[in-house]
A protein has these predicted regions:
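Auxiliary Fe-S-binding modules of radical SAM enzymes
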Residues: 1-50, 54, 66, 82-86, ...
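Nucleotide phosphate-binding site architecture
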Residues: 38, 59, 163
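Structural motif
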Residues: 52, 101, 131-135
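Glycine-rich active-site/cofactor-binding loop and its immediate structural neighborhood
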Residues: 59-100
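Conserved radical SAM core fold
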Residues: 71, 97-107, 137-140, 153-175, ...
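Hydrophobic residues within beta-strands of alpha/beta enzymes
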Residues: 96-98, 130, 155-157, 224, ...
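Metal-dependent catalytic neighborhoods of phosphoester/phosphodiester hydrolases
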Residues: 108-109, 275
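Distinct, well-ordered alpha-helical segments
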Residues: 109-112, 140-149
């Protein structure tokens, strides 16, 4: 049974239906729906959304994720970037998050589609803040260079869990490769803010979480999200424990002392939850001063 702090208010049914109608009208997918995010009612009610590009079927089989898997998903839709840009304009979004399924079947892993989507958003809404949440592109520097050159305001790549749990939770991923990706972003464009996130409750230990946080600071990661893992179905990795809100708060305090510009740490936090608010907090004078002190 889930603890009381994970209970959510019923979403605004009218706002939910309106958002879903808009997404269907534009033929778009969201990670909010695909990953069964517990916050989608709140986000859709506020007119915020995380767009999912490159289809809604993944080539990997992470045991925490609800998105369906397939060795060779359908070819990407070339009209996707423009439709995302039009939907964003229709919603009046000031901060857009774009993520994707992992497409190991594509030569560039979908990097070109990320770049096209950023460019399409900028053409329609030049002032919009674009945040991208990318896969590891199997370690391809060229693919990473493609997305960095498109100059999103934030580049996010989630480590998801601690190294020890990768074989059972992310069997086709590699902790070192993901950490290196975040380092390479800074090598390519030092001023680009990077962001990463972890799910807690998969069986990790406190010292392992702190080690991952330290690893992220060693590659100059700026922003961190920590949230509770929730099992999508009985076939997925079990929840080993529910982490209390007080523990999440302790990690937030430690993270800020480590020098992260901003840390969102709470049971229902997800990597793009309240992304605009997180971005603004990260650019506040207080967070800039904190980051400067920890350099």
């Amino acid at each position: 049974m889930k603890p009381v702090w994970l209970r959510r208010k019923l979403p605004d049914a009218e706002a939910l239906a309106r958002m879903r109608g808009l997404l269907r009208r534009h033929g778009l997918h969201t990670v909010c729906e695909g990953a069964l995010c517990p916050n989608q009612g709140e986000c859709f009610g506020q007119g915020t959304v995380t767009f999912l590009i490159l289809g809604n079927t993944c080539t990997r089989s992470c045991t925490f994720c609800a998105i369906p898997t397939e060795e060779r998903p359908p070819a990407p839709d070339p009209g996707e970037p423009e439709r995302i840009a039009r939907a964003s304009a229709e919603l009046g979004l000031r901060h857009v998050v774009v993520t994707s399924v992992t497409r190991d079947d594509l030569g560039d892993g979908g990097a070109g589609r990320f770049a096209e989507t950023v460019q399409a958003l900028r053409r329609i809404s030049p002032e919009i803040v674009v945040e991208i949440l990318i896969p590891d592109f199997q370690g391809s520097v060229e693919s990473l260079r493609t997305v960095v050159k498109s100059t999103p305001q934030i580049l996010n790549h989630n480590l998801e869990t601690v190294p020890r749990l990768y074989p059972e939770v992310r069997p086709q991923a590699d902790y070192g490769r993901s950490l290196l990706l975040l380092k390479r972003v800074k090598d390519l464009k030092p001023e680009m803010p990077t962001k990463s996130g972890l799910m807690l409750g998969l069986g990790e230990k406190q010292e392992e979480i702190l080690r991952v946080m330290a690893d992220l600071r060693e590659v100059s990661c700026n922003l961190l999200t920590l949230g509770q893992y929730l099992q999508p179905s009985g076939k997925h990795h079990p929840v080993v424990r529910f982490v209390a809100p007080e523990e999440f708060e302790e990690f937030r305090v430690v993270g800020e002392k480590m020098g992260f510009q901003a840390v969102f740490s709470a049971p229902l936090v997800r990597s793009s939850f309240h992304a605009a608010e997180f971005f603004e907090k990260a650019h506040s004078p207080q967070s800039a001063q904190r980051a400067q002190r920890e350099k």
